[in-house]
Amino acid sequence: MDEFHRCGKEDSFWQQCFLYPLFFQEDLYAISHDHYLDVSSSSRPMEHLSSNDQLSFLTVKRLIGQIRQQNHSIVLFVNCDPNPLADRKKSFYSESVLEALTLVLEVPFSIWSKSSVEGMNESKSFRSIHSIFPFLEDKFPHSNSILDARIPYSIHPEILVRTFRRWIRDAPSLHPLRSVLYEYRNSPDNLQRSIIVVPRVNTRLFLFLWNYYVCECESILFSRLKRSSHSRSLSHGSFPHRTHFHRKIKHIIIFSRRNSLKSIWSLKDPKIHYVRYGERPIIAIKGAHLLVKKCRYYLLIFRQFYFHLWSEPYRVCSHQLSKNCSSSPGYFLRVRMNPILVRTKMLDELFIADLITDEIDPIVPIVPIIGLLATEKFCDISGRPISKLSWTSLTDDDILDRFDQIWRNLFHYYSGSFDRDGLYRIKYILSLSCAKTLACKHKSTIRVVRKELGPELFKKSFSKEREFYSLRFSSKAAARSQRERIWHSDIPQINPLANSWQKIQDLKIENLFDQ
């Protein structure tokens, strides 16, 4: 891929018009073969790798020739041969072909991605998951409404192929993609009879399709929104599902209550701020209510005419930040007024003025977290701690470490909220559940466990936040921890919890509109 980038802009026309000959380059299949072996070897033992995994370029070219012919189609998703050895061989070549197809399609996408990175300062785009919370901290307090939308991930194969035709001029190179998409659409495993493009599918092809689909949606959406709203400022944060990010905030970011003065924004010009994490884009708007209604209407029409998708009204919800809360990502987000007393001395006279600023106020969803802990059998539905019976076969150190890991992830992720009193209720549930689990393992009571293990039971576990402040901050900074908001850089560890809670919120909204 680096060789294509070195060619410069003068070869970009050749790269878009003559992609199909790349299918017959042996180096391409060698790269896809090595990538497939790396992925498969990490998921299965080494003794299962035999001589059947040797690559034959002639066989692969024959398979690609069958894909090109419209009257034939290779079986990439369904193995009909009852012979397990033939099944495995067919799956091996199918994965190699899919890897090669993905590599070819990534050529124009990588060129477009590089050009977008070079113009990053102009578009004010951030491409890292660690930037989402500072983005919300800086942009959302100056908005008055939020559009909470969801990207539709069910799309017809032909619509997806037509989006590629806008960037790829070599039509024959899209025939294999069309064959693969239609074959997956007609497979017995796919009950939707449409292409489900989601980032959760652990295949390189569908991950690439998701990134391309989202970038295509956003590139058209940004230009149309900026043109229709006459807005001078359209900042957005887009976070592709990749391992290499274009821009990162590597260190911990601290927002102090005392030093929360921000620049005064102009109230004349409407502003639109766009941020997306995963499948949930959020559009923050500063402007009149008519502008919010226009943006919401435009999003529905945009999906219908550009991608021929009918979106239900509940998929684009509008909220006023001063009255309602938005649930993303794993927080209840709202904006509150923060009064600040300012004293000014001029000509031996003291003037006192009250300055009111808006700041984002993330709320920890205590009740949903307790519901998730009840689902995982740490407590009952009312929040009463119970023993984790499935962990009683582990050692005492493993039990303490597992409970400690859960609490550390929760504390790190939700330390961005000023009001962290609810977290100590979660800590109480986890600590008592840990004690009950140890008591159940040793067939004793909590009192006996505390007496045998002593005070080290709870000092060994649930103390990572104190170690965190003592190692990374001074004593003065640790004393100010209750007045500061801290966004940790290891927040992706808690994503499964935030995503599961977000799914519950989405189901509640869908059930509300289905009634």
Curated annotation (Swiss-Prot):
It holds the Pfam family Intron_maturas2. Its main location: plastid. One of its GO terms (molecular function) is RNA binding. The keyword Transport does not apply. InterPro entries: Domain_X, Maturase_MatK, Maturase_MatK_N. GO terms for biological process: mRNA processing; RNA splicing; tRNA processing. GO terms for cellular component: chloroplast. It comes from the Eukaryota. It is found in: Plastid, Chloroplast. Keywords: Chloroplast, mRNA processing, Plastid, RNA-binding, tRNA processing. Usually encoded in the trnK tRNA gene intron. Probably assists in splicing its own and other chloroplast group II introns. PANTHER family: MATURASE K. Belongs to the intron maturase 2 family. MatK subfamily. This is Maturase K. It comes from Pinus pungens (Table Mountain pine).
